[in-house]
Structures are given as C-alpha cells and as structure tokens.
Amino acid sequence: MDALSHREWECITQMIMEISPPFREAIGIPRGGNVLGKLLNRHGTGKEEDPICIVDDVLTTGMSMNTYREEMDIERWQKSCALGWVVFARVRPPKWIKALFQMPVI
C-alpha cells in the first residue's frame, strides 16, 4: 500500500500492538503486508508457545490470508496457532483475523 508513509505505518503498528495479544513473530503477506509484517515483527516475543501473526494491508475476501495460513510450514507453527491482522477489512473477517478498520458490512 504505497499510499501510506512510513510514519503512518509506524502509527498503525503501534495501534495494533496496543490491542493485540502477544505473538512469536509477524509475517506479511506479499506485497501489501510486507511493510506491516516487518514493523510488527520487531515486537515478536520469539516464544515458541505464542502464535505467529500473519498480516496484510487489506482483506477483501480473506482468501489470501486463509491460503497463506494453510500453506505455512507446519514445523514453524505446530505448537501454536496463527493469528491475523489486517489494516482494512472490506468484509467481515474470519474469527482468527482482526481488522483495525472495518468497512460496513451490508
């Protein structure tokens, strides 16, 4: 999402960190989630028992988040589950994904 400045991404990161449960590491879905993933990863606990956080900028159908979660290396997260964060959700996200900003669901 090239429309946001680095400073705005840092603000979004802080907003997520204020309400997110702890996570081991953050992984951004290419391309839109890359910047957010790198910024959130700085806050990862590194603890194996904490979930991996999968992030993206916009959730439209949820397909890319679900596919990425299903295709993750099982060795990497077998002792924990995944949690998801998106900045903007155009639809109601699956239960494992939280949206910072939710568009009205009609």
Residue ranges and their predicted role:
Residues M1-I106:
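PRPP-associated nucleotide enzymes
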